[in-house]
C-alpha cells in the first residue's frame, strides 16, 4: 500500500530542508520502484510510484508483493534478491541457509554497502544479532534457536566473483 502519514512527514521534511531527505516508502512502493521505475529523486517519479503501488495492491496479495520484493531487492556484491545473495555470500541455495545466515542477509537490506560482511564483518554480525533479537522478542524463534544462531561462526563464500566494489 501507500503510507499516507509517512509520505506526508517525508514531504514536509523535504520541503523544509529544500532537498530530498526522506522517502516514506512502503514495501509495495519499493517494489514499484525496483521493477517499474528508477531511483530518481523527484515528485513526478514519486506520484508514478504511488499509482503503481495502488495498482499492485489491487492485483496482488501482500505475500505476492513481498515475494517480488525479496526476489528483486539489491543486497550488495552484485546480488539481486535473496536467492542470489545466498549464492554470493554463502555459496548455498536459499533452502540450505542457516537461521544465522538468513538473518545476516536480511540485515543487508537497509544498506548493502554499509552492512557488507566482506567489508565490515563486525558491523554485519552486529546487525544480524539485532535481527535475531527482534525475531526472538516477536516470537518468531525460540531462545534456543536465537542462541544457536548467535553462536554460529560466519563462514563467507570467497569463491564467487565478489562484486563488492560496485557498492562504493
Region roles according to the model:
Residues 1-13, 19, 137-138, 146:
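Conserved catalytic or metal-liganding residues and their short signature motifs at active sites
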Residues 19-168:
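Non-catalytic, structured segments within soluble enzyme domains
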Amino acid at each position: 500500500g501507500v503510507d499516507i502519514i509517512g509520505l506526508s512527514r517525508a514531504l514536509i521534511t523535504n520541503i523544509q530542508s529544500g532537498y530530498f531527505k526522506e522517502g516514506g516508502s512502503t514495501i509495495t512502493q519499493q517494489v514499484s520502484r525496483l521493477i517499474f521505475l528508477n531511483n530518481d529523486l523527484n515528485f513526478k517519479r514519486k506520484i508514478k510510484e504511488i499509482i503503481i503501488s495502488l495498482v499492485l495492491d489491487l492485483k496482488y496479495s501482500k505475500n505476492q508483493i513481498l515475494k517480488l520484493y525479496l526476489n528483486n531487492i539489491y543486497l550488495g556484491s552484485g546480488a539481486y534478491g535473496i536467492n542470489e545473495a545466498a549464492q554470493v555470500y554463502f555459496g548455498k541455495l536459499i533452502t540450505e541457509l542457516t537461521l544465522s545466515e538468513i538473518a545476516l542477509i536480511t540485515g543487508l537490506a537497509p544498506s548493502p554497502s554499509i552492512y557488507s560482511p566482506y567489508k565490515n564483518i563486525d558491523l554485519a554480525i552486529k546487525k544480524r544479532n539485532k535481527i535475531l533479537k527482534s525475531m526472538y522478542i516477536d516470537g518468531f524463534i525460540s531462545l534456543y534457536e536465537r542462541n544457536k544462531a548467535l553462536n554460529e561462526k560466519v563462514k563467507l563464500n570467497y569463491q564467487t566473483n565478489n562484486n563488492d566494489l560496485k557498492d562504493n
